[in-house]
Amino acid sequence: MAAAVLLSSCVKDTLYDTPHPDYGKIAVTADWSARGEGIDIPATWTVTMGDYTGTETSATHTPDHLFAPGSYTLAVWNPAEGITVNGTTATIAASTGTRAGTDAFVNNAPGWFFTYTEQVTIEKDKDYPLTAAMKQQVRELTLVVEPTGDAAGRITEIVAHLTGAARTLDFATDTYGAASNVVLPFTKITEGDDAGKWKATVRLLGVTGTEQLLTGEIRYADGNPTPTTLKSDITEALKGFNTGKGESLTLGGTLVETPEGMEVDGAEINGWEEVKGDDVNADL
């Protein structure tokens, strides 16, 4: 009897550090501090890890889900207009309007999109407070051109598009997919120091492929002169576009008409240079 009492007094309960001794648990806090100026923090964001997916509206996501020990890819992103996400691949929607149904053209104004990925190793009986430093993946591009030549004042419309825009991005590997096109919605500046210049603003997931070409047509009042073919290679000016997406990029160039006899045969935009701040009147 005494031996049994002595034996039972030696038995102790196993102590654990968490209420989930066989699993791990995560809490993810999103850090939006790297977003561009004037961009709001997204209203909702999504967390995926293993077979778990959750949506959050607060600063920190603390799911009840328990994770078995192992290695996982944590992916965090926000729903954005015109962008779908499958796994860690984001895809820009096809263009609508006059380009609807044309796979070669993608949406030129998707919503602001942010992502984060991390490899997480889970051990049992542990809690993991994680911080997701959200990376801005959509960048704004503005092109400003100053027409020259006798027909500059007769321009009524610039119809153009940009090649070499990325339609997809695997944000876990920072890999851009095949090149697509985006419409450049040029409008004439009618007020201020830059009146008479033309400007187009788009949002891009990134640039890809070997070149980025601006191609299109310049149209004139009363069809005089006849429409001018427009072409410009801006590959060099966009070579660093996929880095520093938190800052918008403005490029300025001079629209040079090339006459042939009494007709305007073609036009090129030369001297693309970055324009800092709001100053687009920088010797374009």
Predicted regions and their residues:
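C-terminal motif of bacterial Sec signal peptides marking the signal peptidase cleavage site
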Residues: 6-9
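Conserved "repeat-terminator" motif of extracellular CCP/Sushi domains
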Residues: 20-21, 130-138
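Short structural boundary motif marking the start of a folded domain
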Residues: 22-28, 72, 139-141
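Tryptophan-paired
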Residues: 40-92, 154-238
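Structural motif
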Residues: 28-42, 144-153
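Short, low-complexity, Pro/Ser/Thr/Gly-rich segments in the mature regions of secreted, periplasmic
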Residues: 184-190, 268-284
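Structured interaction patches on ligand/partner-binding surfaces of diverse proteins
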Residues: 82-129, 223-256
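Bacterial lipoprotein signal-peptidase II cleavage site
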Residues: 11-17
